[in-house]
Amino acid sequence: MKYIFSILRCYSLTELMSLIIFKLSKRKRYVYYKKENTKWAYISYLPEVFFRQHDDNYLNTHQNKRESLVMGQVFANNGFNFVVESFDTVSVDNRRYDIILGLEPNFCNVAKKNLDALKIYYATGAYYKHQNLMVKVRTDYFNTKHSCHVPYYRTVIENDAADLADFIFQIGSKYTLDTYPNRIRPKISLIDQSSNLYKKISIEQKLKTYRRNEFLWLGGGGSLLKGLDLVLDYFCQHRELILHVLGNINQEVND
């Protein structure tokens, strides 16, 4: 009952019906249209968030929810109609677009149909060849050390997003930039990771309440790639320290 009331507080009847239709639809997309706008943009990212813009519990599950909203707002504020489609579904969109923004594989699918469009790749990870190599290196290390046979998790499907793009917005640092081939680097603009830090934090209060021997690991899938096993090894050797692990933990590390 509490969950139902929380939904009713976040959604009008119209918004709730739109969300239900979206959930039931096979084609996961959101369309923003104003008759006076003549240009169209395609966003390959997260469409569901546009049906849940006032649901803070949903928005706070990952910073990429608000990132998707901001993309749409930028296009709307600059006189564009736009379509947002799930980045990992198979797009059958045949509309002609002026700008294409987002993640593979749909970024690549739609970019190849719109060669004259401005194509902006929104890169959330390192260059795919580097990432796949690091998955292999870290997993092989773990398997050798623990005499096990963990498969490779979090590998990235080979793609030509970076080559197709006119520009690349890359979340990360100079290290991330250096994972790309030299020929691609001039296209890249580094941007900071966004955050869901929406409440004011009192440093004074934190200093009064935190414990110097307790630490927090907060992460999603791909535990080996992120090095959780190395962190656990350290804490096993330092029993005076306490580690709280939150998030999706791959079974191989959990064991």
Please state what every model-predicted region is.
Residues 110-116, 161-164, 182-184, 208-210, ...:
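Short, conserved loop/helix-junction motifs that constitute active-site signature segments
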Residues 106-107, 173-177, 250-251:
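Alpha-helix capping/helix-boundary segments
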Residues 151-188, 197-198:
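A short, active-site helix/loop in glycosyltransferases that binds the activated sugar's phosphate group
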Residues 122-124, 171, 191, 246:
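Generic beta-sheet signal
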Residues 241-255:
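Nucleotide-activated donor-binding/catalytic signature segment of Leloir-type glycosyltransferases, i.e.
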Residues 198-226, 232-238, 243-244:
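Conserved donor-binding/catalytic core segment of Leloir-type glycosyltransferases
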Residues 123-153:
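Acceptor-binding helix/loop patch of EC 2.4 sugar-transfer enzymes
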Residues 1-115:
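N-terminal pre-catalytic "stem/leader" segment of glycosyltransferase-like enzymes
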